[in-house]
């Protein structure tokens, strides 16, 4: 298994025609390719807008099927079994059932400067998928409450707070303003991994012996997480009972919210009773986030080249910048000048946070790809990190027990060829 090296933002980008994806103009007139995805309408319709633009320029129809998220993976799996896969798709994970039917997108990724830290090669040295966009864990503050309390929050890297300093700050805000809670955090292992990374942990790592291990920093992070789930700093009900942290923050009674970039549009549209702001996340020992997003894949078949042409066109600087602006995407290509309008400050902060974060921040996505390419599957939908964290939040067990249970569950469910 090869891992692609991390390159700097200034790495060379090949000329547009170097990989030979684009045809000679109208050669594809009248053709149609099927593109399956989920959530485009809820993200501003960027893919549909680009499909319309592509038709105007080339005469090729990109027929988008926006499938409900809960049905998407099943639809793809059924299509693979019935030999009815679309020509391309934006997926959340790579399914071994159709993994061997993917075209190599390495040329597209290289030509347009997709961040190499996000790429993973299969056993043949190919890149069957790469992220179309990034989501990133991030922090929001109730600016009104912070200002009322006279407490500052960092807006530049030279003023970063640690987790200890951050919790002290939200306690001060809570005491000065009568806010209900200092912090809410999405009940998600994705968010919890980010906190672990910020404590210096690499999380739970699968070794060559097909067994998981972790590090001492994970213990420190989980001890800290347990300590702030005290119904004072954080409400236990979010992790234990499923209370909505988004709604709690939007109530105006919480000083800060540990969530992610996908909240920006919602807050812009739906928070009117107080001022909110994106803030730099705490860094206990290092700066880190946790990256996610949707993967672009092209399936082998009669329309594969036409689909590749569209993907290559989509990731040219002009077109990719346009879809990022329409859909509010954090780009997977560095160095673009994306205009986010009223949300510019928030997205600038997210991009700065990503650029400054340790490489471990992309480990979850990259590792998931490497595992499936290597024939290692986690099995089922189990999420032991979240399950055991719920017990921690509720005071049902200590951290050593939680870690032992997480590793036991991960080991039990992993399959290695």
Question: What does each model-found stretch correspond to?
Answer:
Residues 4-96, 110, 303-306, 318, ...:
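Conserved N-terminal structural module of periplasmic/extracytoplasmic solute-binding proteins
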Residues 91-138, 164-167, 195, 358-359:
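Hinge/lid segment of periplasmic solute-binding proteins
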Residues 106-118, 155-159, 181-182, 201-220, ...:
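Short, solvent-exposed loop/beta-turn-alpha elements that line the ligand-binding surface or hinge
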Residues 170-171, 208-238:
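Glycine-centered hinge/linker elements that transmit conformational signals in sensory
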């Amino acid at each position: 298994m090869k891992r692609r090296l991390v390159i700097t933002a200034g790495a060379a980008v090949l000329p547009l025609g170097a990989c030979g994806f684009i045809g000679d103009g109208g050669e594809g007139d009248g053709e149609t390719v099927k593109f399956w995805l989920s959530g485009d309408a809820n993200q501003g319709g960027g893919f549909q807008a680009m499909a319309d633009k592509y038709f105007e320029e080339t005469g090729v129809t990109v027929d988008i099927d926006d499938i409900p998220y809960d049905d998407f993976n099943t639809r793809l799996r059924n299509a693979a079994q019935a030999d009815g896969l679309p020509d391309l798709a934006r997926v959340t994970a790579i399914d071994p059932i159709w993994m061997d039917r993917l075209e190599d997108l390495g040329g597209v990724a290289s030509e347009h400067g997709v961040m190499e830290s996000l790429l993973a090669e299969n056993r043949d040295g190919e890149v069957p998928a790469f992220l179309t966009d990034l989501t990133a864990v991030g922090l929001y503050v109730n600016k009104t409450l912070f200002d009322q309390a006279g407490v500052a929050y960092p807006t530049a890297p030279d003023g970063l707070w640690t987790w200890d300093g951050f919790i002290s700050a939200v306690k001060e805000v809570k005491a000065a303003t009568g806010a209900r809670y200092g912090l809410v955090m999405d009940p998600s292992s994705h968010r919890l991994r980010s906190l672990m990374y910020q404590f210096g942990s690499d999380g739970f790592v699968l070794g060559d012996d097909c067994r998981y291990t972790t590090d001492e920093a994970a213990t420190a992070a989980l001890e800290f997480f347990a300590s702030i789930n005290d119904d004072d700093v954080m409400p236990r009900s979010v992790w234990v009972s499923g209370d909505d942290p988004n709604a709690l923050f939007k109530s105006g009674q919480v000083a800060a919210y540990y969530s992610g970039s996908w909240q920006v549009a919602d807050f812009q549209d739906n928070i009117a009773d107080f001022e909110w702001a994106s803030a730099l996340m705490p860094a206990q020992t290092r700066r880190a986030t946790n990256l996610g997003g949707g993967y672009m894949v092209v399936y082998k078949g009669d329309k594969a080249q036409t689909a590749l042409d569209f993907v290559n066109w989509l990731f040219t600087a002009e077109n990719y910048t346009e879809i990022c602006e329409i859909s509010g995407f954090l780009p997977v290509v560095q160095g673009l000048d994306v205009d986010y309008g009223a949300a510019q400050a928030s997205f600038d902060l997210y991009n700065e946070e990503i650029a400054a974060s340790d490489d471990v921040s992309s480990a979850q996505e990259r590792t998931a790809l490497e595992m499936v390419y290597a024939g290692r599957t986690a099995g089922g939908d189990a999420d032991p990190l979240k399950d055991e964290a719920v017990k921690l939040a509720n005071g049902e067990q200590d951290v050593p027990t939680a870690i032992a249970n997480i590793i036991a569950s991960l080991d039990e469910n992993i399959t290695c060829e």
